[in-house]
């Protein structure tokens, strides 16, 4: 049994005088049930154990409810159903929580839903990919899964235990064990936040990436072409946004704020472009830490990105 969602988080303004089209997220959201029609499903991963292990600033375990509150009062422009499937809560046993989340993702995908994960530290990424891989392996012997990560960090660290700094190395190892290609594209890499050893590791693994300074509004055509080339090489897409890819002024509520970062307008545009490819199967938003946020700026950014993925 999975815990029921806390529907009390879905509260906000009601514009009844404006008619039926004056809808907001909190009015449209429904608790998930196994007989629900295929639609978008929000699934939280309330964890910052990976952040703690990675020597970061804790608080991301409070991200999922903060993100729901930020979503609740947004105008709803969709027609399809949307459901809240609650949170997988991680304590000290991160690995068990990742397994639980992966199985939940696989089950939801098997029922035809598109899952949007709400983090939580970026340790959500390994759990998300594992769930997608589990689902696709039931139908394809050699699925070509692309991983699109908007992030200031490669997250390819070597460590004795899983953390928020290791998920894509773990995914690479999972792909190697399954004899699958490791197709990883990272947009927004900070040269000063990744050691030479991590750049070497990325090169060995064939990671495609663009630096934060290359992802500029005035250089959008190059970024689009880079993304399109990656999307053409895969059949299925897992998209993850680590909020520290954004400038600290836009997203202060993360463990490791970016001095440079990539503007929200660029990130949102490329997220929408990836979604429009028709290959998106699973997405998540990671590293929202409301304890470090200022005036809910980061939560609002995260909510807008979730809306971009859903509507």
From Swiss-Prot:
It holds the Pfam family Arginase. It catalyses: N-formimidoyl-L-glutamate + H2O = formamide + L-glutamate. One of its GO terms (biological process) is L-histidine catabolic process to glutamate and formate. It comes from Pseudomonas aeruginosa (strain UCBPP-PA14). Catalyzes the conversion of N-formimidoyl-L-glutamate to L-glutamate and formamide. One of its GO terms (molecular function) is agmatinase activity. Signal peptide: none annotated. This is Formimidoylglutamase. Mn(2+) 2 binds at residues 151, 153, 242, 244. Binds 2 manganese ions per subunit. InterPro entries: HutG, Ureohydrolase, Ureohydrolase_dom_sf. Pathway: Amino-acid degradation; L-histidine degradation into L-glutamate; L-glutamate from N-formimidoyl-L-glutamate (hydrolase route): step 1/1. Mn(2+) 1 binds at residues 122, 151, 155, 242. Its EC number is 3.5.3.8. PROSITE patterns: ARGINASE_2 (PS51409). Its cofactor is Mn(2+). The keyword Hydrolase applies. Belongs to the arginase family. Keywords: Histidine metabolism, Hydrolase, Manganese, Metal-binding. It comes from the Bacteria. Transmembrane segments: none annotated. The keyword Cytoplasm does not apply.
